[in-house]
Amino acid sequence: MLRLVLPKGSLERATLELFEAADLGVARSSSVDYKGTIDDPRVSEVRILRPQEIPAYVAEGLFDLGVTGRDWVEETGSPVVSLGELRYSKATANPVRIVVAVGADSPAEKVDDLPQGVRVSTEYPRLTARYFAGRGIEADVRLSYGASEAKIPDIADCIVDITETGRALRAAGLRIIDTILVSYTEVVANAESYADPARRHAMGQLMTLLTGTLEARDKVLVKLNVSRADYDRVLPLVPA
């Protein structure tokens, strides 16, 4: 019924582990196969693609449902329906942040200290351009295909980059001066597919499985042998 697309790359392992724990395990012929199957009648197709591409493909109707980051929904501006957050990222349950960072020796303490014409290296050119325009700063936004932190100071004056803990930026001698966006992993749907009652119902069931699995990670299963005579006295003492 549902054509599903999952993220490849940094979110891939955590996403596949979540689906496995939710009894929605993805079977593939190899770890580099971009196609998979889920033994569930609600899922007819599984593809694994870069998260940057997923919002546009879902909006276009190539897939009914996708897992990507809020950062890429904002960057692409794709008109998708958000079904909600899945609170995990590459290494932790914390969100990632899209931040503005400068070299440790930069005189800029905040974004408004950056000069007009500031050179910005980023993998998020649209999001970055909108952000600086909103601050009234004319920015020379330069698309980066990675390792943005290595481009300060000779190629760029600052970067807009993604970070989960900030450690990599600090290790590169950079300092964060603002956060543009806090981004969780998100489930997005095609608008027409979501308008179909049967598909929307199936989407809701899958979301319940995934969010329930995440919530259960913070829970502990406690089993007790209690006599019927003591049941009413013991029950209020059990945390739930």
Put a short name on every predicted segment.
Residues 1-240:
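Domain-level signature for soluble enzymes in the chorismate/prephenate branch of the shikimate pathway
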